[in-house]
Amino acid sequence: MDKVNNNCCCGENAKPCCTDPNSGCCCVSETNNCCKSDKKECCTGTGEGCKCTGCKCCEPAKSGCCCGDKAKACCTDPNSGCCCSSKTNKCCDSTNKTECKTCECCK
C-alpha cells in the first residue's frame, strides 16, 4: 500500500489547494487525506483506499517556493508562473525569482 503524503493532510496544516473548490482537490474528513474532487466517493464516502495520486496540490512543494502556512494556492502551483521567496515569504515570478509585481496571484 502506498504511503500517503503527509503534506496532503487536510487538518490544521492543510495546503490551501486542498480546501479550494477550484483546485480539483478536496478533503476527506474521515482520513484527512487530500483527493481528487472528481472521485466523489473519496469526499463523501468512507474514504477507504482514497489516495491522492493525480492532484497537483499533493505534489511536494519545490524548495524555495514556500510562502508560509497561509500561502495562496497559486504560489505553490508550478503552472501559475509564480513561486515564493523563502527569505521574504513574498510571492515572486518563477522565471527570475524576483519579487512578484505583475503576478495575479499576489494581488
UniProtKB/Swiss-Prot annotation:
Reply yes or no: does the keyword Iron apply: no
Expression triggers? By cadmium.
What domain of life does the native source organism fall in? Answer: Eukaryota
**InterPro entries in the record:** Metalthion_7 (IPR012484)
Q: Which residues form the propeptide?
A: 1-2
- Which keywords appear in this protein's UniProt record, sorted alphabetically? Cadmium, Metal-binding, Metal-thiolate cluster
The residue ranges crossing the membrane are none
User: A Pfam family matched by this chain, by name?
Assistant: Metallothio_Cad
What is its biological role?
The metallothioneins are involved in the cellular sequestration of toxic metal ions. Binds 12 cadmium ions per molecule.
Q: Which family does it belong to?
A: Belongs to the metallothionein superfamily. Type 7 family.
User: What is this protein's record name?
Assistant: Metallothionein-1
Query: In which organism is this protein found?
Result: Tetrahymena pyriformis
